[in-house]
Swiss-Prot record:
GO terms for biological process: translation. Belongs to the bacterial ribosomal protein bL12 family. NCBIfam families: L12. One of its GO terms (molecular function) is mRNA binding. This is Large ribosomal subunit protein bL12. Homodimer. Part of the ribosomal stalk of the 50S ribosomal subunit. Forms a multimeric L10(L12)X complex, where L10 forms an elongated spine to which 2 to 4 L12 dimers bind in a sequential fashion. Binds GTP-bound translation factors. Gene3D superfamilies: 3.30.1390.10, Single helix bin. Forms part of the ribosomal stalk which helps the ribosome interact with GTP-bound translation factors. Is thus essential for accurate translation. GO terms for cellular component: cytosolic large ribosomal subunit. PANTHER family: 39S RIBOSOMAL PROTEIN L12, LARGE RIBOSOMAL SUBUNIT PROTEIN BL12M. Keywords: Ribonucleoprotein, Ribosomal protein. It comes from Prochlorococcus marinus (strain MIT 9312).
Amino acid sequence: MSAKTEEILESLKSLSLLEASELVKQIEEAFGVSAAASAGVVMAAPGATGGDGDGGAAEEKTEFDVVLESFDAAAKIKVLKVVRNATGLGLGDAKALVESAPKTVKEGIAKADAESLKKEIEEAGGKVTLK
């Protein structure tokens, strides 16, 4: 790997979740591409190799996204603490994430972890869906 690409990679590793999201939007605009389109293709590919067709119905989803849909205004600080703890975001980034609900808190996590995080956020006063 060249020194330039290593430097870029290290810079990307230090981005917060919100900064990474902003970067994706800027890249999409600058190059006229869509990150969502390629993700849809990747998600469709496993079903394409399903074989006889009814194998897909028996498959259970293994990765989930935890989405904060809304929260009780009186419980905002509690929800913020849970989200901050779960994501490792700084206070400002976690606050921005919570205030911009509905927003994905964590992506591609195991079912047990997703259900545990959902329970924590709901106990703190948030409304959560798993996708």
